[in-house]
Amino acid sequence: GIVGHVKGSSTAVGREAGFRAGLGEAGTQAAEIVFCDSDSDKAYEQTKDLLKKYPSMDLIVGLNEYSAVGAARAVKALGKTDQIRMGSIDSSMEQIQYLEAGIYEALVVQKPFNMGYLSVETAVDVTRGRKTETSIDSGSELITKENMYTQENQKLLFPVTK
């Protein structure tokens, strides 16, 4: 199952397409997608409903923090953490705790420093009349329980701010 955030948003559309493509043929057969409007309580209820409708479901992905957290809370509340493999996009403290506990198998974590840097760099290029790309990939990292404490991944999961 897929728990998305805002139906029709470019991030929801792109993330769903990428998830399905990554699964190949199995992705075309994924149960269904629900949208929680970035409300973790709604995602919780929707995930419980999905699991009632599809009792043999064994994979759920949350396409943003709120959808993923609500889905994980539901899976945990229903005692199905051993039955259902979960993945998530983003990296709130609650998501990191679920990864550490083995509820999520992986987090896809964005690189916010790159986002900011490349945004400013592109804005400067535009003001100087330079041709720029219409889409810029700032990168992401697949974080698992096994690699979450490497030095580079710690910087993504636990950024030091002033």
Question: Where do the language-model regions lie?
Answer:
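Class I S-adenosyl-L-methionine
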Residues: 17-27, 72, 100, 124
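Hinge/cleft segment of the Venus flytrap/periplasmic-binding protein
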Residues: 3, 7, 111-162
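Hydrophobic alpha-helical
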Residues: 19, 37-98
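Local beta-strand N-terminus motif with an aromatic residue
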Residues: 30, 56-57, 104
